[in-house]
UniProtKB/Swiss-Prot annotation:
Keywords, alphabetical: Secreted
Record-stated family: Belongs to the WXG100 family. CFP-10 subfamily.
Organism the protein comes from: Mycobacterium tuberculosis (strain CDC 1551 / Oshkosh)
Complex and partners: Forms a tight 1:1 complex with EsxV.
Protein name as catalogued: ESAT-6-like protein EsxW
Amino acid sequence: MTSRFMTDPHAMRDMAGRFEVHAQTVEDEARRMWASAQNISGAGWSGMAEATSLDTMTQMNQAFRNIVNMLHGVRDGLVRDANNYEQQEQASQQILSS
């Protein structure tokens, strides 16, 4: 399988935008899931069942938070690398033109 490196800063920023959209989607769905769990929690659940459900939902919420953080990390890395690539390309052009 051939590896392809992304060297187009505009494409890198576009891809970063996609990662931001994915992060927002995960965050929105996690928020809905948490709200739903809170609604269920008061609907006749009590004792160990409610505590276990809340613990599970808390762990899942943290897992989703970790996913969002990773997606933001990829987004930030793509933007940073696009900026670095442009700066290096500019420096190379200046060296070649002198």
